[in-house]
Design a protein with these regions (language model features):
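Short beta-strand edge/turn micro-motifs at domain boundaries
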Residues: 129-152
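Flexible low-complexity loop/turn motifs enriched in small/helix-breaking residues
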Residues: 1-128, 148-153
């Protein structure tokens, strides 16, 4: 029987932290790419990556996992999880508080290759979407590459 991702909060938080870090930093070395606030959709969505998904699967990100992600990223940004992603988009299409909105795909069960779709949005001309390949164990995970389409505007 496969273990569900939500059965191991360390694993889920480690994977999500690695993906969020890679999505936000994107390999930049000459400036700090972190926004003051990072809003994260509290619902994982299979449509988070750059590839169209016919049947969208959603799964709430458990509170314990949310807390661990917030703690792991606290040195870089203030993390706030939101139930309604549209609630942080201002009328001019920017994200509230000079922030960024991140949407993540669900973590696959243990024993499978970990590919996580993720997208960030900071305004009409500030979107990134990618599928990350993540490797590790327990709470120690790192992005080892990407696969498929990388979308940016």
């Amino acid at each position: 029987m496969e273990r569900r991702a939500e059965d191991d909060p360390d694993r889920s938080a480690g994977i999500y932290t690695a993906v969020i870090s890679a999505l936000i930093t994107g390999g930049y070395a000459n400036f700090d790419p972190w926004r003051p606030v990072t809003y994260i959709d509290a619902t994982a969505r299979s449509s988070a990556g750059p590839v169209a998904v016919k049947d969208v699967v959603t799964s709430p990100i458990p509170i314990e996992v949310q807390h661990r992600i917030g703690e792991a990223l606290a040195a870089h940004t203030e993390v706030r999880f939101v139930d309604d992603p549209q609630s942080v988009i201002q009328p001019d299409s920017r994200v509230r508080d000079h922030g960024v909105l991140v949407t993540l795909a669900p973590v696959p069960p243990a024993g499978r290759l970990v590919r996580i779709g993720a997208r960030s949005y900071s305004g009409n001309l500030g979107r990134n979407s990618c599928t990350f390949i993540v490797y590790g164990t327990g709470a120690q995970w790192q992005v080892t590459g990407t696969t498929g389409i990388y979308s940016m505007s």
